Amino acid sequence: MTAPFAIRRLNAADPDFGRHLDHLLSWESVSDDSVNQRVLDIIAAVRSRGDAAVVEFTQRFDGLQAASMADLILPRERLELALTRITVAQREALEVAAERVRSYHEKQKQGSWRYTEADGTVLGQQVTPLDRAGLYVPGGKASYPSSVLMNAIPAKVAGVSEVVMVVPTPRGEINEIVLAAACIAGVDRVFTIGGAQAVAALAYGTESVPRVDKIVGPGNIYVATAKRHVFGQVGIDMIAGPSEILVVCDGQTDPDWIAMDLFSQAEHDEDAQSILVSPDAAFLDRVADSIARLLPTMERAEIIRTSLEGRGALIQVADQAQACAVANRIAPEHLELSVADPESWLPEIRHAGAIFMGRYTAEALGDYCAGPNHVLPTSGTARFSSPLGVYDFQKRSSIINCSAEGASVLGRTASVLARGESLTAHARSAEYRILDEKEA
């Protein structure tokens, strides 16, 4: 017999609300010492033995019999074949989603700029793409073609010359729709490897796997730990925590809609977090009833139940101002403003990965096909970080081109500051370029 469902209820008027909220939001990665050491050993092996180590780990962890790295490379023709092996509806959905993602990210492209000062000195900024990006994609039946689109398309829009995808194929299991997504997104090379060994291969390069400049994409605790260790050798997107959603509702949305929106994140895994905030206590009761009634109808009911009971909450607030204060404190990955006039709320929202405005804007639309990226900051990091975008695959270089007059004027200032820091060579380097009065 299934136990009665119970989700945490909080009230922002409670004197201990802050402490209870902190407890609700607390989450620590489970990367313990044993995981950390295993990852370090794998990275060291890949650095020293290259392809041989990658093949060995792939055989051991993925149950895949490969004689050499040649068996772990998928040519472009294989990606094109995948397009013919998925349904017409799947291909059309991928193409629609890809076009919307591409169109949105085209608007994020940053351009170079410069300006000229009165003395002829030119200052500016040059924007250039990364040479090569690595994309990690989880493998097996539970893999996510939408993640391929969201990670690869911004890189190609940015002008990255080569996108290298790694995707494990446990026991040889290949997900055709993931390969089809890679084809549509413009992925250049695919290796059927995964885990920490794939991250290490991308970061340091092997005889077959080219070294990349940045690694993006989700993965398990071994992948996340490996990304943390190779950061600095390469760039990474983020160390993502569990998925999360915060719904703020005025009490006028269908409670079944809200319940299903909460489920949409809770079904990811047991650590996912789904929270509803509303000033209407009776509405919170109705949503709780909807959750209890709809939960048994869900395919992933036990995962949803564990997530909601362990990390979910229904929070009552006094008004819009308090709701926004709670939202900013949580800084959620996904924020739904399921209210009558979401535009009036927007100026008060400072911290959120993505903001879904109005009753009709389900978070699931953003996950797949709205256009904005679904790779978002989690665990409160929206306080200081942003969604993945084109700018993550571009670099900026400062441009300084001094005229003789400009170098002379700046040289005097630089000399004073350099000598104040006792850096004589700096000072003299600037002073050599100072014009004497008859030259000026």
Swiss-Prot record:
Residues forming coiled coils: none
Q: Does the keyword Amino-acid biosynthesis apply?
A: yes
Reactions catalysed, as given in the entry = L-histidinol + 2 NAD(+) + H2O = L-histidine + 2 NADH + 3 H(+)
Q: Which cofactor does it need?
A: Zn(2+)
Concerning Gene3D superfamilies, the annotation shows: 1.20.5.1300, Nitrogenase molybdenum iron protein domain
Q: Per its UniProt record, what InterPro entries does this chain match?
A: Ald_DH/histidinol_DH, Histidinol_DH_CS, Histidinol_DH_monofunct, Hstdl_DH
> What GO terms describe the biological role, i.e. biological process, of this protein?
L-histidine biosynthetic process
State the UniProt keywords alphabetically: Amino-acid biosynthesis, Histidine biosynthesis, Metal-binding, NAD, Oxidoreductase, Zinc
What is stated as this protein's family in its record?
A: Belongs to the histidinol dehydrogenase family.
Q: Where does substrate bind?
A: S243, Q265, H268, H334, D367, E421, H426
- Recorded GO terms, molecular function? histidinol dehydrogenase activity; NAD binding; zinc ion binding
Which superkingdom does the taxonomy of this entry point to?
Answer: Bacteria
Q: Which GO terms describe its cellular component?
A: cytoplasm; cytosol
Per its UniProt entry, what is the enzyme's top EC class, as one word?
oxidoreductase
Please tell me whether the keyword Lyase is annotated for this protein. no
Q: Which organism is it from?
A: Pseudomonas aeruginosa (strain ATCC 15692 / DSM 22644 / CIP 104116 / JCM 14847 / LMG 12228 / 1C / PRS 101 / PAO1)
The EC number of this protein is: 1.1.1.23
Q: What does this protein do?
A: Catalyzes the sequential NAD-dependent oxidations of L-histidinol to L-histidinaldehyde and then to L-histidine.
Which residues are involved in binding Zn(2+)?
Q265, H268, D367, H426
Pathway this chain belongs to: Amino-acid biosynthesis; L-histidine biosynthesis; L-histidine from 5-phospho-alpha-D-ribose 1-diphosphate: step 9/9
Protein's gene: hisD
Q: Where does NAD(+) bind?
A: Y136, Q197, N220
Residues annotated as the enzyme's active site = E333, H334
Give the protein's recorded name: Histidinol dehydrogenase
